[in-house]
Amino acid sequence: VLDSINHMTEEKDVQRAFDRVSLFMNPGALFVFDVNTLYKHREVLGNQTFVYDTEEVFCVWQNALDEKTDKVRITLDFFERDGKVYRRSSEHFSERAYSRECLEAMLQKAGLEVLAVYGDLTFAPPEKDCQRAVFVARKPENPEKTGE
């Protein structure tokens, strides 16, 4: 999974995805996904640059945070050794962080009930400085439970 939801940078697209997931779920089925948190986008990725230097590749990872939308524009530049020279390739994409409340509301609107939200690799609620949250939602056996 690894933050696929964050790659949808518009709420309407996330809502549409949740609606489609719900449409094809059997009653009682679970939907589990993870997201990068607001904390990670604001405090870890933010307007930071990271450099990774290995034997195979040299990578420069640059982030630009829009604080109004919590969107991070990510640019990855890879330099891969090819004999005596390096070949450069680049990737550009954006991610958006959504609040827990926003995601829970969208899941409920899609007819799903939120069973739990966990911190990354735990079965405990996410801490304030948690970088990844895991959501567990279910399509109810009785749709009236979510207000459909």
Please place each PLM-identified region on the residue numbering.
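A short SAM/SAH-binding and catalytic strip from SAM-dependent methyltransferases
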Residues: 1-12
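A short glycine-rich, Lys/Arg-flanked "PGG" loop and its adjoining helix->strand segment in the class I
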Residues: 14-30
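SAM-dependent methyltransferase
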Residues: 11, 32-106
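Short beta-strands and strand-loop turn motifs
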Residues: 1-2, 34, 118
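Extended, non-catalytic scaffold segments that flank or surround catalytic motifs
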Residues: 7, 17, 47, 98-100, ...
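Residues lining hydrophobic/aromatic ligand-binding pockets adjacent to catalytic sites
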Residues: 1, 15, 37
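C-terminal lobe and adjacent flexible extensions of AdoMet/dcAdoMet transferase-like proteins
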Residues: 94-148
